[in-house]
Amino acid sequence: MDFKTYQIKARETAQYPDLGSNNIYPTLGLVGEAGEVAEKVKKVIRDKNGIFDNESKLGIKKELGDVLWYISNLCTELNFNLEDVALQNLEKLKSRAAKGKISGSGDDR
């Protein structure tokens, strides 16, 4: 599935207050789901000596899907095309790599 199709299908399942004019809801959802990814990774470190078994990976995969859903809906709320966001990110990283500036901090490296 491509990003355009995903964004359309994700939007079909969106149900939250002020749909179409509410960028706060998907932003908060994104942060919450990213926290759930981090929590699952933390538990692998704590409970499984850092070994990611199939069960752990599947749980993380589900949470990553939720992260993607919220990213997609936030893009829609902001009138961004998810595919354009992904391509712009890769172009930025390629430019940084060409300049030898992948490491470091700041948006304008």
Model-found features: residue ranges?
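Flexible "arm" and connector segments at domain edges
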Residues: 1-109
